[in-house]
Design a protein with these regions (language model features):
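Conserved Rossmann-like nucleotide-cofactor binding loop
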Residues: 22, 45, 167
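Predominantly flavin-linked oxidoreductase catalytic cores and closely associated redox partners
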Residues: 118-258, 281
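Conserved hydrophobic helix-helix packing surfaces used for dimerization/oligomerization
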Residues: 14-16, 37, 289
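Beta1/beta-strand and adjacent pyrophosphate-binding region of the FAD-binding site
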Residues: 5-22
Length: 301
């Protein structure tokens, strides 16, 4: 093993695969109970993650339980109201309660990095550029094979938490993945800048006739930027590969252009991702392995 790499052979109480919000939240919670926790992630932080960037009331309450400080996120934007547009064109403002925080927007690249920093500060060992390969489970522990910067290593843990997303390599390696499963929903998003219309300060949800029961959104960020996108249910009635054409059309609709302003500029490339939302049917644990977040298909719960 190269001398500049950490030795991961020491036994830990919990090994978590994936340093997204589900993984870091589990790690922070466990380390506060006096457990020895290690997280591995194939990425190097900060890294982006395809997401709408909106934080619901439940998400904010969970962050409060972690004693997370929004001030550690440069682009954190509190939301005081949601603006909805019906398929018929009627617009409605829904104010948030004024006795706390009930919605916010923050880029995942910033939020996830801030949670990684907090987890490290509380004693969690986080190993980046470390890819999960396989595991061997026995009655007392789990031996996990990983690839750390192209160097094979093994980690032994009493328990494993798989927070490794929709495609969950851990779930797949245990033979628990459903063949052909692509999620219940599919979403598409991109960032825009030079937003001079009302979208630069409003959280907007458009219920478009052709997207129902899905919807489109524009979530405000600092410096006249927004996260804009749409999501549709996988019901077999539309081809997911046609989403790019839907996106092009959506950005030309008069009410969307009016909200963004005439000179908005789309940034970089668009991204799309599947959304698993069937936790009631999902296998959330197997022996010494637990699944959380998207790996547990827990969207919207």
């Amino acid at each position: 093993m190269p001398s500049n790499l950490p030795d991961l052979s020491t036994l830990c109480d919990i090994l978590i695969v994936g340093a997204g919000p589900a993984g870091t939240a589990a790690a922070i919670t466990a380390v506060r109970q006096g457990l020895n926790v290690t997280i591995i992630d194939k990425a190097v932080f900060p890294r982006d993650k395809c997401c709408g960037d909106g934080l619901t009331t439940l998400a904010l309450r969970e962050l409060e339980k972690l004693r997370f400080d929004p001030a550690t996120v440069p682009s954190w934007t509190d939301i005081d109201a949601a603006w909805l547009r019906s398929p018929s064109g009627r617009e409605l403002r829904l104010p948030m309660p004024n006795n706390g925080k009930f919605a916010a927007v923050t880029p995942r690249v910033e939020l996830d990095n801030a949670l990684v920093i907090q987890a490290r500060s509380e004693g969690v060992t986080i190993v980046e550029d470390c890819t999960y390969e396989s595991m061997a489970v026995n009655s007392e522990s789990v031996c996990v094979s990983v690839n750390l910067k192209n160097t094979p290593q093994q980690i032994t843990a009493s328990w494993v938490i798989a927070a490794d997303g929709m495609w969950s390599p851990v779930r797949k390696s245990l033979g628990l993945s459903e063949s052909g499963y692509l999620g219940e929903w599919h979403a598409f998003r991109q960032y825009a800048n030079n937003v001079t219309g009302v979208a630069n300060e409003r959280l907007i949800v458009w219920f478009e006739k052709d997207l129902l029961p899905g919807y489109a959104w524009s979530f405000p960020l600092p410096n006249n930027r927004v996260n804009i996108g749409f999501g549709v249910v996988r019901d077999g009635k539309r081809r997911i590969q046609d989403m790019k054409d839907v996106w092009t059309d959506l950005l030309q609709r008069p009410h969307v252009v009016e909200a963004l302003g005439p000179d908005f500029v789309m940034e970089d490339r668009h991204t799309a991702w599947p959304i698993p939302a069937r936790i009631d049917e999902a296998i959330t644990g197997s022996g010494r392995v637990l699944f959380v977040g998207d790996a547990a298909m827990a969207t919207d719960t």
